[in-house]
């Protein structure tokens, strides 16, 4: 890879740098995104980052019944962003192939996806806010859908992290997060 003249950009000492990274290995495929501050941030950039982080954490910590679809989980993940009447115009996540296409279904976290989640499915958790000529923020990890057991209310599923790459905390407006997400981030 090398940047072409019409698409390369100078990294200016303000705002964010979004790094979408991954690789194909004989033991699997990775897809990770982090957004790093590279200089002073506006209040709006810090708010957006905090809301995206909250969405990301909520998805990673989700506990749900075994009949939930990608559409239901996508809606759940968008809650912290929608609470501020903001939306991200992409899915929250996609299935990940094994030594194949990094975007592979049938599972995904997006509007109108009717696929029911099952243990063993791998998914990305990548909410983001993108405003043309203003800001681009995404935090992406990979998660595995896991079985959390059954009780009188149903069969429960959740997610286990597959990506252990530090998340930048510098931009976070800590006062806008409750104790549980802060604990998750620190753990």
Task: Annotate each predicted stretch with a short phrase.
Residues 1-187:
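Active-site neighborhoods and metal-handling regions in enzymes and metal-associated proteins
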